[in-house]
Amino acid sequence: MLNEFIAIRRDLHQIPETGYKELKTQAYLLAYISKLPNKHLEVKKWRTGILVLVKGTKPEKTIGYRTDIDALPITEETGLPFESNHVGNMHACGHDLHMSIALGVLTHFASKPAKDNLLFVFQPAEEGPGGAKPIMESEEFAAWRPDTIYGLHIAPEYKVGEIAIKPGLLFANTSELFISFKGKGGHAAYPHLANDMVVAASAFVGQMQTIISRNIDPMDSAVITIGRIHGGEIQNVIAETAFLDGTIRTLSPETMEIVWTRLKQLAKGWEEAYQCEVEFHPGSDYYQVDNEPLETEEFIRFLKEHYPESYVPARSAMTGEDFGYFLSEIKGFMFWLGVDSEYSLHHAKLNPKEEAIPFAIDVLINFLESK
């Protein structure tokens, strides 16, 4: 018999929706939650997200658990019988697993409340434009603001049954990068009468990397990645405009500030050198996931005692996750959950092993009951 929450994961996998468009997802989650014993439950909607409070038997504090619910604009290539019904969208970052795990934990505590209050946060728009900060600033969240908060993220590189975590910095600071170049177009036969923005943008890509190699302390770490370049429309016309889309990832907010300062300085020089306009366009920012040491060490001790084969010391990663905004104000942690997939996060063929779902539910229930 298929595990109930694996079946739920497959349902959710078929209806992936991007940030703040998670209407079917929200409706599915609400329909499921409405069937749970409701004596101890209170439910609030926030935009396309949901907050569920499970009232404790003798509450002294509120413990939060957050899951993200959105998908990515990726065309799925898994060939699974339950692949995406929304062509062009895919749960390629495991949020379908995240949701099914959260529902599994919620289901248990709806019937068997813990001593303290539990707040389940079903957060939209993690992949962009970023839902953590806005939901934290909402009246709905403020009314039930937790004293601690936890979360997880699937990890294809770890085996099922493994949990990787570390105190301190787990995920990097991340900023989306969108740059436009505007010059003067013209006929390919008369380059001296135009300002070629393909040339300007291409040169800028290379020059950006000197920020990493020459402006960042070599004992620190930062990455600038340009994932998309677009310029011009026709092969025999010099491009009047060009666009660069990418990301910046750093291990500290201070290093992020250095990168941005140097980028803007370079842009001013480019405007002079290439007789063009260079403009930066706003994107999403993700604050570092910095695990609170005492909370994290408590979880590690729990794993070593109850799941001794599961604990794996994690390394800091350049991954971006807006759960960091929660941890910037509320103590807690995030951990990697092994799902043993040959394809990486954000890959069109990502196929996590579903056995990780009941395992994670079991770990979280036992940990929360131990609090």
Swiss-Prot record:
GO terms for molecular function: N-acetyldiaminopimelate deacetylase activity. Its EC number is 3.5.1.47. It catalyses: N-acetyl-(2S,6S)-2,6-diaminopimelate + H2O = (2S,6S)-2,6-diaminopimelate + acetate. The active site is at residues 68, 127. The keyword Hydrolase applies. InterPro entries: AcetylDAP_deacetylase, Amidohydrolase, Bact_exopeptidase_dim_dom, Peptidase_M20, Peptidase_M20_dimer. Gene3D superfamilies: 3.30.70.360, Zn peptidases. It is an enzyme of class 3 (hydrolase). Signal peptide: none annotated. The keyword Zinc does not apply. Pathway: Amino-acid biosynthesis; L-lysine biosynthesis via DAP pathway; LL-2,6-diaminopimelate from (S)-tetrahydrodipicolinate (acetylase route): step 3/3. Keywords: Amino-acid biosynthesis, Diaminopimelate biosynthesis, Hydrolase, Lysine biosynthesis. GO terms for biological process: diaminopimelate biosynthetic process; lysine biosynthetic process via diaminopimelate. Catalyzes the conversion of N-acetyl-diaminopimelate to diaminopimelate and acetate. NCBIfam families: amidohydrolases. HAMAP family: DapEL. Belongs to the peptidase M20A family. N-acetyldiaminopimelate deacetylase subfamily. This is N-acetyldiaminopimelate deacetylase. It comes from Listeria welshimeri serovar 6b (strain ATCC 35897 / DSM 20650 / CCUG 15529 / CIP 8149 / NCTC 11857 / SLCC 5334 / V8). The lineage of its organism: Bacteria, Bacillati, Bacillota, Bacilli, Bacillales.
